Amino acid sequence: MQSLLCVRQYVKDGNEKEKALAAKIDELWHGMEFDWYRNGDQNVLYWHWSPNYGWEMNFPLEGYNECLITYILAASSPTHSVPAACYHEGWARSGGIKSASKPYGYPLELKHNGAEEKGGPLFWAHYSYIGLDPRNLTDQYANYWNVVRNHAMSDYQYCVTNPKGYKGYGPDCWGLTAVSYTHLTLPTNSR
């Protein structure tokens, strides 16, 4: 949705086809029921609902990971917004999101889900910021520009240090991201 909103802003004053596209995007934006993903009135958003399984997956979106943008969009929805408590209790885990970890001397500021000590894949630092500029974005938990910068710097330093001796890691090959497999065939095998 964040990318569509960027497109909408770009084409809204364009030709008739572009204006029609902007109107469709706006209709979709107004129709997104972010508040429904609270699974009742819980102060957290849930990953998904299925017509076959309902809320069975029971996967709350808690930070820090790529889901920050979901809370930003949900809070700013013109029709189906969520209360601030949803962000603070859900995303920020009632303050439990804060971290004192400093991999390679770079403060993470936030606990990266599943990678609290050293930070997670850079996908987490990129996805929410496709259409959201982290510069000057702060709240009581973090300065998000620092979060993104320090995450990238610690990732870079990890690859330069290469503590596990992975082939190719180094100052010219870094930027680890999330994948669902461990065997790559091109250009070379890596982990």
Task: Describe the residue ranges of each PLM region.
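Ser/Thr/Asn(+Pro)-rich, low-complexity disordered segments
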Residues: 1-184, 191
